[in-house]
């Protein structure tokens, strides 16, 4: 800033006149000052506004990334639920059949066909088998559960609407993983290779009132139905007819051969 001052001019007069003039005239005006302020130089834009814009851009970018990640998560869940789980369910469900020689019903060996639907639950470690009504006889329709966690097998005879529970026979029933591998190996065709049939005989012993103690899988199968415990007969009798009085037969397979389970009442 520049300061400029102006002083008044002094006339060459005598002192007395000057005194008179100074006495009669008003006091001279003070020196005039003019302040000149130099023009301000144009300031560059503050960095603060630029920093605020950068922060806002980062926030928008972060929000966009969050939305994108959420979209990817939802898409992954959708694909997992509707494609992977559906494919897994298809791989664990089998509709298959087996051709076997029936040597139990008569002396003449006849070729029979057995169909069943199999659901294998690898994580829960159990198998569920549905045997529809046989086309040419040979047993009752049934639902069967092999619970490897509980070590139990349950037969629901659909014709009688009764449930029968017995200890799991691991010498006949393949574990879920082995049974699944067997069925996957033969999934290319409709039927398993031709095989044979064996027979096991059981007798009911007592009525089961506490079905919850049998486990959730068997409970859902047998709830609301008369349920009995079975025991294997130590010495098998010779039964000429599967439809003999006081006995019912269920034919099924959980291995490379067919099993006929005879369930008989106490004689």
UniProtKB/Swiss-Prot annotation:
Keyword Repeat appears in the UniProt entry: no
Cellular localisation: Lysosome membrane; Cell membrane
GO molecular-function terms, A-Z: amyloid-beta binding
Annotated positions of the Phosphothreonine modification: 37
Boundaries of every BRICHOS domain copy: 136-230
Keyword Transcription regulation: no
Modification note: Type I membrane-bound, as well as soluble, furin has a pre-eminent role in ITM2C proteolytic processing. PCSK7 and PCSK5 may also be involved although to a lesser extent. The soluble form of PCSK7 is incapable of processing ITM2C. Fails to undergo shedding by ADAM10 and intramembrane cleavage by SPPL2B.
InterPro entries (UniProt xref): BRICHOS_dom (IPR007084), ITM2 (IPR040145)
Transmembrane segments: 55-75
Domain of life, source organism: Eukaryota
Site (Cleavage) residue list: 242-243
Stored Pfam families: BRICHOS
Disulfide bond positions: 163-222
Assembly mode: Interacts with BACE1. Interacts with APP. Interacts with STMN2.
Family: Belongs to the ITM2 family.
Protein name (record): Integral membrane protein 2C
Gene name per UniProt: ITM2C
């Amino acid at each position: 800033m520049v300061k400029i001052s102006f002083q008044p001019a002094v006339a060459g007069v005598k002192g007395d006149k000057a005194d008179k003039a100074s006495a009669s005239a008003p006091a001279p005006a003070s020196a005039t000052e003019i302040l000149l302020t130099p023009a301000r130089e144009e300031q560059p834009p503050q960095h603060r506004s630029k920093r605020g814009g950068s922060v806002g851009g980062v926030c928008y970018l972060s929000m966009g990334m969050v939305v994108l990640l959420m979209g990817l998560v939802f898409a992954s869940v959708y694909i997992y639920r509707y494609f992977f789980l559906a494919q897994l369910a298809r791989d664990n469900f089998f509709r298959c059949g087996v051709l076997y020689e029936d040597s139990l019903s008569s002396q003449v060996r006849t070729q029979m066909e057995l169909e069943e639907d199999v659901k294998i639950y690898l994580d829960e470690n159990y198998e569920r088998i549905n045997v529809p009504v046989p086309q040419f006889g040979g047993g009752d329709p049934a639902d069967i559960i092999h619970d490897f966690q509980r070590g139990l097998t349950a037969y629901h005879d659909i014709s009688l609407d009764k449930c029968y529970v017995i200890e799991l026979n691991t010498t006949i029933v393949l574990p879920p993983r082995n049974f699944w591998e067997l069925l996957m190996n033969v999934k290319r065709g409709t039927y398993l290779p031709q095989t044979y049939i064996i027979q096991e005989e059981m007798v009911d012993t007592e009525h089961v009132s506490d079905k919850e103690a049998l486990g959730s899988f068997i409970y859902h199968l047998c709830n609301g139905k008369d349920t009995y415990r079975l025991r294997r007969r130590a010495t098998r009798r010779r039964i000429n007819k599967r439809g003999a009085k006081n006995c019912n037969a269920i034919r099924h397979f959980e291995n490379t051969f067919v099993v006929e389970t005879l369930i008989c009442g106490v004689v």
